[in-house]
A protein has these predicted regions:
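Lipid interaction determinants
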Residues: 2-9, 17-145
């Protein structure tokens, strides 16, 4: 009987030491700030975000994402599946976003459109890079403090 109690205590201790999100779901519980939008169009090129704190995404373990897009806030579902140790597929469901009129100039419309076109992610150099549909661009994110 004593052996079973010890084994039970060891099992509980080992479970407590496990990762906080299920294996293979590296986005869960992470928060990011947008630092730049890279377009494959020479006309647009790369646009640096002046205030990264105005454009954020938080990934929940419940497969929901929360966004700040300039002066608006929103949420969506997301689907992510690892394709390798540092990358995988990523798509967002329809984004429910408040509709406040943000002071101009604003990247609100461009960022919202791009989020709907995200198809994959990759971690590199401590950042999250989201690639868009048909390789049309990349959203570059840094960890939010």
């Amino acid at each position: 009987m004593r052996t079973f109690q010890i084994l039970g205590a060891v099992a509980v201790a080992l479970t407590a030491c496990g990762p906080s999100s299920p294996p293979g779901r590296p986005l869960d519980g992470t928060n990011w700030r947008l630092v730049s939008l890279e377009s494959m169009s020479d006309e647009q090129g790369t646009t640096a975000v002046d205030d990264p704190g105005k454009y954020t995404v938080s990934f929940g373990a419940d497969q929901r994402a929360a966004f700040r897009v300039d002066c608006n806030r929103g949420n969506s579902t997301f689907q992510a599946a690892p394709g390798g140790p540092d990358s995988g597929t990523l798509t967002f469901g329809p984004i429910a976003l408040t509709r406040m009129f943000c002071p101009q100039p604003s990247l609100e419309q461009r960022v919202t459109t791009a989020l709907g076109q995200v198809r994959s992610y990759r971690f590199a150099d401590g950042r999250l890079h989201m690639s868009l549909l048909a390789d049309s661009g990349i959203l570059h994110w840094e960890p939010a403090g």
